[in-house]
């Protein structure tokens, strides 16, 4: 994590995994520091709230075992529900240690800082294809991370596209692939 700290003064590592420092106590610790970074970044415009409803089309390009891959997806808001009482399903058990860490961070920042990775059935790929059509010709925000993964992000604000994608995805189950602890903490924190 030290390399990520050095990479950029606004690296999200300062929020997600702020390091412990000598002399940390109840009033000044990794969670309160993360909250201060978040507050300052919002004030400075490093992080900004999008005022309009949107879907965020997200691509990752990476190599594995000598092959090139493109992972396509999108970010959206979902309704928080208890597992088994709605359409959101876990695939693994969670543990108290990681949940406590995420709870302390969420309480300090009053924000969910990272997305939950979910999968839903769409054998015809209808939702993603609508989004790919919506971003055709857009210049994405692009960044390459410390592992060499290239990230592309495009914002879709077209109400018709958002409505159509929502109609496809809303009735389907969502299986959490990564982020069980974050989901449970977000649900408990609402």
Where are these predicted regions, by residue range?
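A cross-family signal for N-terminal binding/gating loops and helix N-caps
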Residues: 1-187
């Amino acid at each position: 994590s030290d390399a990520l700290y050095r990479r950029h003064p606004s690296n999200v590592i300062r929020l997600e995994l702020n390091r412990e420092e000598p002399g940390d106590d109840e009033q000044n610790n990794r969670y309160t520091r993360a909250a201060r970074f978040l507050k300052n970044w919002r004030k400075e415009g490093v992080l900004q709230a999008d005022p309009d409803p949107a879907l965020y089309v997200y691509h990752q390009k990476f190599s594995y075992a000598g092959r090139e891959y493109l992972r396509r997806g999108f970010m959206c808001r979902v309704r928080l529900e208890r597992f088994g009482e709605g359409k959101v399903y876990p695939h693994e058990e969670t543990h108290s240690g990681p949940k406590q860490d995420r709870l302390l961070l969420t309480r300090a920042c009053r924000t969910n800082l990272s997305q939950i990775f979910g999968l839903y059935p769409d054998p015809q790929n209808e939702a993603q294809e609508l989004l790919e059509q919506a971003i055709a010709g857009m210049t994405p925000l692009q960044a390459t991370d410390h592992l060499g993964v290239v990230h592309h992000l495009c914002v879709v604000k077209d109400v018709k596209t958002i409505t159509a994608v929502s109609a496809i995805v809303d009735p389907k189950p969502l299986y959490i692939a990564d982020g069980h602890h974050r989901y449970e903490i977000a649900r408990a924190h609402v």
